[in-house]
Amino acid sequence: MIKLIVGLGNPGAEYAATRHNAGFWLVDQLARMGHVTLRNETRFHGYAARATLWSHEVWLLQPQTFMNRSGLATVALARFYKILPDEILVVHDELDLLPGAVKLKLGGGSGGHNGLKDIAAHLTTQQFWRLRVGIGHPRNLLPPGTAPSGQHDVANFVLKAPRREEQELIDRAIDRSLDALPDLVAGNAERAMMRLHTTG
């Protein structure tokens, strides 16, 4: 059963449309579905709201600490409400999946994602759920015949907005995720993964 859904991203209007904020996009959708407003909660270092989703109470959180300090916000809320690591779902952008792909898993490494790394360090465990929203890697998304250059490095790539066709694929992946989340929130992870990984 999931009691806390954390969307990863960077605060501020200048980052709102960037690939690194894919986690924020999904949590924004959940807030709309739950008819709640994410409010600045200084004790949790982020925007948070408690929503009733699919007949379950779930906390929604968007850390406002910048990506590399996401663990600070996640642990503050989880400890306050006595939420266990395996009751937490972290939604994040994933370079190793193409736009349109999305994967759900429990545990595993951080894959070089600094937000995940910081959350694992603060929770002192890797055993939390991750929803990996594919954004692609600059080496896979270059036009044919284009050689990678400095401007295509990963740090620059994740802080840019996706191209229109990529954004459409990411939006579709988020919609598919929302279809699978009721099962995960209710504690049926196997069915959620089957639904997510065998569609689209």
Swiss-Prot record:
Keywords: Cytoplasm, Hydrolase, RNA-binding, tRNA-binding. Gene3D superfamilies: Peptidyl-tRNA hydrolase. The active site is at residue 20. The keyword Zinc-finger does not apply. Its EC number is 3.1.1.29. It catalyses: an N-acyl-L-alpha-aminoacyl-tRNA + H2O = an N-acyl-L-amino acid + a tRNA + H(+). It comes from the Bacteria. The record marks 93 as: Stabilizes the basic form of H active site to accept a proton. One of its GO terms (cellular component) is cytoplasm. Its main location: cytoplasm. GO terms for biological process: protein quality control for misfolded or incompletely synthesized proteins; rescue of stalled ribosome. TRNA binds at residues 15, 66, 68, 114. Transmembrane segments: none annotated. It is found in: Cytoplasm. GO terms for molecular function: peptidyl-tRNA hydrolase activity; tRNA binding. Pfam families: Pept_tRNA_hydro. The record marks 10 as: Discriminates between blocked and unblocked aminoacyl-tRNA. HAMAP family: Pept_tRNA_hydro_bact. Hydrolyzes ribosome-free peptidyl-tRNAs (with 1 or more amino acids incorporated), which drop off the ribosome during protein synthesis, or as a result of ribosome stalling. Catalyzes the release of premature peptidyl moieties from peptidyl-tRNA molecules trapped in stalled 50S ribosomal subunits, and thus maintains levels of free tRNAs and 50S ribosomes. Monomer. Belongs to the PTH family. This is Peptidyl-tRNA hydrolase. It comes from Ralstonia nicotianae (strain ATCC BAA-1114 / GMI1000). The lineage of its organism: Bacteria, Pseudomonadati, Pseudomonadota, Betaproteobacteria, Burkholderiales.
